Amino acid sequence: MLKKRKKILCIMALAALAVGGCSGEKKETDAVFRVGVPHLMATYDHTKGFDGWSTTRIGVGQTVVRFDAEGKLVPWLADFDGNVFTVKDVKFSDGSKVTAKDICDSLTNSCEKNVRARDVMKQSRWKVLADNKFEYIGEKSILTDPLFCIAKGNLYTGGKVISYDARKAVVERNGRKYEYIAIGDSTTRGMSIETGEVDAVFDVNPLYYKNREHEEVGGARTIMGRLNMRPGRPLSDPKLRKTLAECIDLASMEKALRGYVLCNPNYSRYTKSNRTYKPGKADKPATLELLFYDSRPEFKIIAEATQMQAKAAGIDIKLKNVHVNALRDMELGGDFDIVLSSTTNIQSGTVENYYRLYFDSASPENTTKYSNPAFDNAKSLQEMQDVIDKDYAVIVYGNPLHNRVSKKKLAKLNPLDFYYDVDEVK
């Protein structure tokens, strides 16, 4: 009888362990996955503001096609054969099926609500062919831009937004909750993985790699110092622009930035500036204001190095650290002399579109008011670069690395940071 009782107790104990084990596994699976990101925009509505990146970064917005980690254009919401697209079996977050009409209406809606969307889509056309087919005539890579996430009202095809503000986004995706926490200061962001506050973090100092899963790739970005040439601004003087540009030792600056290199040519085809380091002196003392934001870890280094080297040329640069969400309004207002930007090279689909976005005289995003018919009429990427180099319209610092540090192994890191991939590798 005693043996029988012991046997029953053992079976109960094993059962309890089994239940406890299953419970523990479920708890780990259901746990909130926290991600530290440089910033979130004020809204996840992809049509508002400049880019719509927050929508894709938090795994909510998806586009018709996307670039994969190898730089290849691949289907996402629709397969394509030439100009004809066939919608996959995908649904909005409320469970309703995505149709070709939904996609065409969404593209039209983006263009109606967003100036940049209208500008980059001005040569493109689309129409519904059938319930699950549509025709798109234009540069396909433009469809990767998060401005063209597919949505119906506030419904997207990725995760469901539980709550959102510029500090934190909570998203439910594939039965799990994700919190995307905006941590602007890169050092604080790095410490968040050190202290265990987050499970993964993007774009931090490599010192946080130790004993953790990490991956870094050549980012699909170019760091530029764009120069305000509006009438009455100091840098409307071409001589001052030349002195400023030539006093900066770009080679030594790249070394300080850990030798950042160009990434996969499918993402970025920017060739190095042909400008030489030739420090001189300004004709007269000049004071300039440089805007930057420190959610990019390299910006503070670049800003301070530029300030120091310009001082030797008789140019006093005042640094102004602003929140990234305030930067655009300041640019549009024209109250700056230099603005540091780190923007995806294939924004709006191609590198050529990227250049035209910032330097074409007719572009609404040309906040520096640079104007040269030779650039507007340029036929090739190299020709565009040669013209802006000759005019000293921009200081090109290089291409930053993109990295991710995590507690566990995650899906391959995409150089194009439209996507913050955090899916765990099983």
Residue ranges of predicted features:
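N-terminal lobe/hinge region of extracytoplasmic solute-binding protein
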Residues: K4, G36-T86, T108, F418
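Extracellular/periplasmic solute-recognition and catalytic clefts
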Residues: K127, I162-E172, E179-G232
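Local pocket/hinge segments that shape ligand/substrate recognition
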Residues: F202-G280, T367-N372, D391-S406
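Ligand/substrate-recognition segments at binding pockets and active sites
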Residues: K281-N345
